[in-house]
């Protein structure tokens, strides 16, 4: 998937190719998941809750990020699209997440990313849980403004930044 990401960034592959590769990767990871011993690499890399914030029904990019993170060895809990803010916090508590990934594809849903971070603070979890944001309207400046730990422009970058933050 890393090579697919690189080729996509260079304009050598297009979104349908990336989606097919992600589907194949997901099928492969799922087929092998049961064969992996308990306490294997995925538990060592970190636990990530990933979803698209409330009001946004787009999930192609988020799904590709989830697949690539999982294939890189992270335990990923993809909680879907149009996810209420509180659900991110509840799932993070349930699985003892190290990081929450917040996707938004519409400018009108960007505030949901900020709201999750604020709720993490209210719940006393902000120092324990890293936050990565992404999506077409998201930027590094937005990440800085809302206090996210990082911004990833694409799935390959999301894997790199997750590895850096959770090392």
Swiss-Prot record:
Methylcob(III)alamin binds at residue 58. Signal peptide: none annotated. InterPro entries: Cbl-bd_cap, Cobalamin-bd, Cobalamin-bd_sf, Corrinoid_p, Met_Synthase/Corrinoid, Meth_synthase_dom. Residues 1-44 form the B12-binding N-terminal domain. Residues 45-167 form the B12-binding domain. GO terms for cellular component: cytosol. NCBIfam families: pyl_corrinoid. This is Dimethylamine corrinoid protein 3. It comes from Methanosarcina mazei (strain ATCC BAA-159 / DSM 3647 / Goe1 / Go1 / JCM 11833 / OCM 88). The gene is mtbC3.
């Amino acid at each position: 998937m890393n090579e697919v990401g690189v080729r996509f960034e260079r304009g050598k592959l297009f979104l349908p190719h990336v989606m097919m590769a992600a589907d194949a990767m997901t099928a492969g990871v799922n087929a092998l998941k049961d064969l992996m011993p308990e306490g294997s690499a995925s538990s060592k890399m970190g636990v990530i809750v990933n979803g698209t914030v409330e009001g946004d029904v787009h999930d192609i990019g988020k799904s590709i990020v989830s697949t690539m993170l999982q294939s890189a060895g992270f335990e990923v809990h993809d909680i879907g699209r149009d996810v209420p803010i509180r659900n991110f916090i509840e799932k993070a508590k349930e699985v003892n997440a190290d990081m929450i990934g917040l996707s938004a594809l519409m400018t009108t849903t960007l505030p949901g990313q900020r709201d999750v971070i604020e709720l993490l603070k209210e719940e006393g979890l902000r120092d324990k849980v890293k936050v990565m944001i992404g999506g077409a309207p998201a930027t590094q400046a937005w990440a800085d403004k809302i206090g996210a730990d990082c911004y990833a422009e694409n799935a390959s970058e999301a894997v790199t930044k997750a590895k850096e933050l959770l090392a």
